[in-house]
Structures are given as C-alpha cells and as structure tokens.
C-alpha cells in the first residue's frame, strides 16, 4: 500500500467502451502536472455495465483488475469519478436564498424526486452545490443549485470498483463541471480586453450518443445542458443557441469557444464561428497540466473531463 499524498490527485472518466484515468502531482506549490494517463477499453459498454441500476455485475471483476493495474499504486487519497449527463441525473434548480437550510434540503429532495421519478430519494446517492447566486425580477436573491444523483446501486458498485485501489474514498462529478475547471485554468493565464467585455465561455462536448454544453462566466461554472438529438454541427449549434437563450445569455456575450469529446473535427464547427464570431478551439488539458512522462495525450479532447475532475483537489 503506497503512502497517501495530498499533493497527488487521481480521476477516471467513463464513456462508451473507454475508461480513461489520470494522475496529477504538484511539487513545491507549483501547478499540478500530469504524472500518468491512459485509456482502458473493454468489449462492452461501460455505462451499461457500471452506471445503470440493473448493470452487468459480471463485468465488474474485469474492470476492477484492469483499473488496479493502471492505478493500483497511486498515493492519491481520493478518486474523482467523472460521468456524462446521460449516465446520471444532472440538473439545476433555483432555491430562494432566504429559505432556511433545512427547508432547502427538503426542496432539493422534492425536486430530485420530480426529475428522477424515483419513489424515494433514499434510492439515490445525491450531491449538490450552489453554483451561483442572483436575483429574481423583484430583486429577491436566489441560488442556482446543481444536483448530481446516481442510483444507490450504482454508487455501491462504484465503491466495489474503487475497493481495488489505494484511495478508499471517491466523489462523483459531471463532465460539464469538470471541463469548466480546465477552461478556468486556461483563461487564468490572461485574456484580451475584448474578452473581458464578453465574459462567457461556451464548451461543447461531442459524443456519439449526445452533445454536452458547459457555460462559464468569468472562469466560474455557470450552467450546463445536454441534448441527445444534436448529432450534426448545425444541430449542435441550434441547441447551443437555445440553451443560451434559456439561461438569458446573449450570443455576443460569449468570448471563447472550446470543443472536447471524441472524433473531433474542429473544422466542422464552422456554424458556431458564424453565430458567435469566435473560432472554436480544441479543449486540450495538456495546456494546463503538461504532456506527462509518456508524451502528449493521444486524444486530448477526450481527456478533458478526466483531467478536470482530477483538478478538483487543486482549486
């Protein structure tokens, strides 16, 4: 068993048949650097096997063994687990800032039951965080709270999986929040005066099953959305505009545009450049954490959620 080290962070992300893992290390107060990264592939869909309430437990042992080979000697105390929106329940809900804490929790549980359709929220593993505070039309303060929930059976299964690793604790994070951590680090390096007047950053995640949208304002995560119907660049742009309209963000308020995910062709995002007047950039986490001892990542855009999840310890 390795000695636990608070300067080390580890994460994994689950998508299709791929389980990606990273380990970050910080030395002498410097920025975290990539220590190891890799992709484990399986002849079955990991989301179906691991992240469904009726998942295939027969595959768990195989994944445990492969993950133990990859991260079995990590000194990280906690493992961050990044999942994509369709693989859990991820939503935002407004709550009045004047509501007592106990009543806030009750409202969150009621909203979660409504969104998920479960008979009892005791069937879920639930996490929540206040993303931002704003005011309603009458000037009353309220909070936008993000909720991430997975079936309790899924959480127990993840506990069995993590049991093969040195970290005994793990936390869930949705991919759209994780990638916003990466953009925050990239933008912290500086920006132009024009970008200061356009404070929003839009990040688009491209996957075979869905498209993700993460929105940040002044480097802080602001809101998120996903669409299963957005398969073409034109449809992705259409849903992006609808998302921004829904949260009241003007199109000319977007100062930077990133894309991440799998099978990326940034040239196919010409409709976004026409709409937002910004050239899309591939969200490459190597710009933040370096290439690592084994050289550049083979698909940097695909690793953005995993690296962003691991960065949680350094925020």
Question: Model-derived features: where do they sit?
Answer:
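Small-residue (GG/TT-enriched) beta-loop-alpha framework at ligand/catalytic clefts
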Residues: 2-3, 7-40, 75, 137-253
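Phosphate/oxyanion-binding active-site loops and adjacent basic polyanion-contact surfaces
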Residues: 56-63, 232-236, 298-305
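Active-site neighborhood for divalent-cation/phosphate handling
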Residues: 78-187, 288-289
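Non-catalytic, solvent-exposed interaction/assembly segments
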Residues: 1-117, 141, 275-279
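Glycine-rich phosphate-binding/hydrolytic loop that grips phosphoryl groups
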Residues: 179-185, 283-315
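Glycine-rich phosphate-binding loops at beta-strand->alpha-helix junctions
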Residues: 254-278
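ATP/nucleotide-binding catalytic cores
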Residues: 57, 199-203, 269-274
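Short glycine-rich phosphate-binding loop at a beta-alpha junction
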Residues: 75-86, 170-171, 251-263
